[in-house]
């Protein structure tokens, strides 16, 4: 498996504390939301991201406002770290008029274009072709922005994800794929859905690098993501020049 070079992107003490703040906020929000669901006060379909906060923070921290994310259904924290307030997000989960979708939806289907957030789709993996389209737009418009596309290891077996990765590799798009491997896809263990050890092993076949990172190590996730983003921006600039 080709591996992404380990870049040392230095973080100040203040930045490390800020990352800790995001980790704690996202976990606390998720825990509170889970309680509200059990109490019957929030009736929307809520998919907990507890235990995956380091992936959200490590990948989103340091993104520019005009960089786009296409989050997974468990990635509520990406909305927070990208700039949506906790109050607005809670209003969204309550389907209130003050939420992102003005009461029309109580999940994460609403996007926030001005913050670089494309709303989640109900079909797992279907966000990746959209991400490829966004990345192609950035390339054609000669912008050095990047797109982050999130999906699970189960969705990695779908045609949508395969086509998006193949398209991104062929056209050298400024797109970073983030696979959140939590071992189980619904009730299906990973060893019964793929013959390889890591989803990242597939990257070489699409013509780009991949790396398997400890998703609970926020600094390792940050370093790997920043390295991938730096190369994606450089690729976009080279293609435009």
What name fits each language-model region?
Residues 18, 28, 163, 220-223:
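Generic recognition of stable, solvent-exposed alpha-helical segments in well-folded globular domains
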Residues 31, 35, 41-171, 189-195, ...:
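Cofactor-binding active-site loop characterized by glycine-rich and histidine/acidic residues
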Residues 150, 177-178:
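Residue-level marker for buried hydrophobic side chains located in beta-strands
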Residues 21-37:
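N-terminal glycine-rich anion-binding loops that anchor highly charged ligand groups
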Residues 180-240:
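Thiamine diphosphate
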Residues 1-16:
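Charged, compositionally biased N-terminal leader segments and the immediate start
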Residues 173-174, 236:
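Loop/turn elements at helix/coil->beta-strand transitions in domains of secreted/extracellular proteins
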């Amino acid at each position: 498996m080709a591996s992404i070079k380990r870049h040392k992107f230095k973080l100040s003490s203040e930045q490390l504390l800020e990352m800790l703040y995001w980790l704690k906020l996202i976990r606390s929000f998720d825990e509170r939301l889970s309680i509200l669901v059990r109490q019957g006060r929030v009736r929307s379909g809520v998919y907990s991201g507890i235990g995956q906060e380091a992936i959200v923070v490590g990948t989103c921290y340091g993104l520019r406002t005009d960089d786009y994310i296409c989050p997974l259904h468990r990635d509520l924290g990406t909305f927070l770290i990208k700039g949506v307030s906790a109050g607005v997000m809670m209003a969204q989960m309550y389907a209130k008029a003050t939420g992102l979708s003005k009461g029309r939806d109580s999940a994460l289907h609403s996007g926030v274009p001005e913050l670089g957030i494309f709303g989640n789709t109900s079909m797992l993996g279907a966000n990746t072709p959209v991400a490829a389209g966004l990345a192609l737009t950035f390339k054609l418009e000669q912008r050095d922005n990047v797109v982050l596309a999130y999906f699970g290891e189960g969705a990695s077996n779908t045609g949508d994800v395969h086509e998006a990765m193949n398209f991104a590799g062929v056209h050298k798009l400024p797109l970073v794929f983030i696979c959140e491997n939590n071992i189980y896809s619904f009730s299906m263990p990973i060893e019964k859905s793929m013959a390889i050890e890591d989803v990242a092993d597939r990257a070489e076949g699409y013509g780009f690098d991949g790396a398997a990172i400890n998703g609970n190590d926020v600094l390792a996730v940050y370093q790997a993501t920043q390295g991938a983003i730096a190369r994606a921006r450089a690729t976009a600039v080279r293609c435009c020049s």
